[in-house]
């Protein structure tokens, strides 16, 4: 006659990032804190830029839900967004849209600020390590091709030993290879 009420177990409502590093979580926490500060200060440009960053990061998390996300992923993502802003600036300059150029430059400055705050090696440090590696390879094998140079690097340890993203190292190898060989 009377039915017993089913107990509903509470579920976790928040999203827990099991596959991410501590510095990745700290960077996201800093972005959210800065978003709150921008909202309180009514800084529309900074607010929309940070929201765009958080949206892009969330999309990356969805795309790579089974992979570990780290500061190097954020570095690559920020670098991609900065290059998009640079392309937009050249387009706006060609079309004489100075107002949009100023907006894109300001957004690019905000993104560069967050990129420089990440605990990764600078471009100069990466270039010096790549240059030294390529010089050592040239002494051993003077007729080395670029494809073979990529094979000589242990890509699994680039993040931990070089403190750099593999994409940044690859770009540096392409740039430095022409100078050395």
Swiss-Prot record:
Pfam families given in the database record = YqeY
What are the UniProt keywords, alphabetically? Mitochondrion, Transit peptide
Q: Which GO terms describe its molecular function?
A: carbon-nitrogen ligase activity, with glutamine as amido-N-donor
Q: Which domain of life is it from?
A: Eukaryota
Q: Give the residue range annotated as the organelle targeting sequence.
A: 1-18
| InterPro entries listed in its UniProt record | Asn/Gln_tRNA_amidoTrase-B-like (IPR003789), YqeY/Aim41 (IPR019004), YqeY/Aim41_N (IPR042184)
Give the SUPFAM superfamilies listed for this entry: GatB/YqeY motif
Q: Gene Ontology cellular component?
A: mitochondrion
Any idea where this protein resides? Mitochondrion
Q: Which family does it belong to?
A: Belongs to the AIM41 family.
Name the record gives this protein? Altered inheritance of mitochondria protein 41, mitochondrial
Name the source organism: Zygosaccharomyces rouxii (strain ATCC 2623 / CBS 732 / NBRC 1130 / NCYC 568 / NRRL Y-229)
Task: Please state the gene responsible for encoding this protein.
Answer: AIM41
């Amino acid at each position: 006659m009377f039915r017993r009420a089913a107990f509903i177990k509470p579920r976790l409502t928040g999203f827990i990032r099991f596959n991410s590093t501590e510095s990745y979580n700290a960077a996201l926490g800093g972005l959210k804190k800065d978003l709150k500060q921008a909202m309180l200060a009514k800084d529309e440009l900074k607010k929309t830029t940070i929201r765009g960053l958080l949206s892009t990061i969330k999309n990356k998390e969805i795309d790579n839900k089974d992979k570990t996300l780290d500061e190097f992923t954020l570095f690559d993502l920020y670098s991609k967004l900065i290059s998009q802003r640079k392309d937009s600036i050249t387009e706006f300059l060609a079309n004489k849209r100075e107002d949009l150029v100023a907006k894109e430059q300001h957004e690019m400055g905000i993104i560069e600020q967050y990129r420089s705050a990440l605990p990764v090696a600078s471009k100069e440090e990466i270039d010096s390590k790549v240059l030294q590696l390529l010089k050592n390879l040239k002494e051993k094998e003077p007729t080395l091709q670029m494809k073979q140079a990529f094979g000589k690097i242990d890509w699994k340890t680039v993040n931990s030993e070089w403190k750099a993203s593999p994409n940044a190292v690859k770009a540096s190898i392409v740039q430095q290879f022409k100078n050395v060989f």
